[in-house]
Design a protein with these regions (language model features):
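Conserved active-site segments centered on acidic
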Residues: 2-40
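Conserved short-loop catalytic and cofactor-binding motifs
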Residues: 4, 8, 53, 79
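Cofactor-cradling patches in redox/metallo enzymes
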Residues: 24, 32, 44-49, 54-74, ...
């Protein structure tokens, strides 16, 4: 799975990437790739990813994100609590749900 996290460019999303990578390794999730990018990068890079999740700090851009990726692309918002505590299990569950797994 290739998961793109969209944020405002803060350090917290980089920490979340590390938690997701650690969770993937501990649970035998192979071929996992995750990166964090700012919202303005989305139009140029989203097609290279399986799923795009955005943090609560950029949820005001949700309409822009949906318009950018189109109606059928797997796109979702990470819940504020899951984002704040780095709940990798719930974030993976969200990604899998969006991917139809």
């Amino acid at each position: 799975m290739k998961m793109l996290l969209i944020c405002a460019g803060g350090m917290s999303t980089s920490m979340l990437v590390k938690k997701l990578e650690k969770y993937a390794a501990a649970h035998g999730i192979e071929d996992f790739k995750c990166e964090a990018h700012g919202a303005m990068d989305l139009p140029e890079i989203y097609k290279n990813w399986d799923v795009v999740l955005y943090g609560p700090q950029v949820s005001n851009r949700a309409e822009f994100f949906r318009e950018t990726v189109g109606p059928d692309f797997p796109l979702g918002k990470i819940e504020p609590t899951d984002y704040a505590i780095g709940n990798a299990e719930k974030i993976f569950a969200l990604a899998n749900k969006l991917l139809g797994k």
